[in-house]
């Protein structure tokens, strides 16, 4: 359960930061004002950053009975998935590609990092807790990344074809940004 809570912290941090004016500048999230709209930009940055570190605090909590090897594997994987080669890099690519023509492989790379890496972590963590082999954990990681990519493709499709009422946010925003 602690790993699930940590994942939700990482997910929430990434959404709060993604909505910031310096990123996507989304005013709504799930039909409600984005964090920076409701509490201000500085508080949103601090909230997102706090959630990122809280995820690791939750995993290392002593009351959860993970052995040190598994705990270290999970911490390392979560850092990789959320950091400079994962979610953060995916966000950077999103900014870099804004209003530019993109090749399909660039879109896939960005989406695998921005969204797929968190799904990657979820399945890897299951393999770690279940003491699976490295080969099995690698398979689970790749499967998670592919599921994340499919999720993001579906989200992009809904952004293009859905309605504000259905999604709880303005639609066709991603299309306008290229």
Describe the role of every protein-language-model region.
Residues 1-100:
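Acidic catalytic motifs of isoprenoid enzymes
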Residues 1-23, 76-88, 116-127, 137-165:
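Active-site alpha-helical segments that house and flank conserved acidic catalytic motifs
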């Amino acid at each position: 359960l602690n790993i699930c809570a940590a994942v939700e912290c990482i997910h929430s941090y990434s959404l709060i930061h993604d909505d910031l004016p310096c990123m996507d500048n989304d005013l709504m999230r799930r039909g409600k004002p984005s964090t920076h709209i409701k509490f201000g930009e500085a508080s949103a940055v601090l909230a997102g950053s706090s959630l990122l570190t809280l995820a690791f605090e939750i995993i290392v909590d002593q009351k959860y009975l993970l052995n040190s090897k598994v705990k270290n594997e999970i911490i390392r994987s979560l850092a990789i998935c959320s950091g400079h080669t994962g979610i953060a890099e995916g966000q950077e690519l999103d900014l870099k590609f804004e209003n530019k023509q993109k090749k399909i492989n660039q879109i896939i790379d960005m989406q695998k990092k921005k969204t797929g890496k968190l799904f990657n972590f979820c399945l890897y963590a299951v393999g770690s807790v279940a003491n699976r082999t490295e080969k099995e954990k690698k398979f689970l990681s790749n499967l998670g990344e592919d599921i994340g990519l499919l999720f993001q493709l579906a989200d992009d499709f809904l952004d293009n074809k859905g309605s504000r009422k259905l999604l709880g946010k303005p639609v066709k925003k991603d299309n306008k940004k290229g």
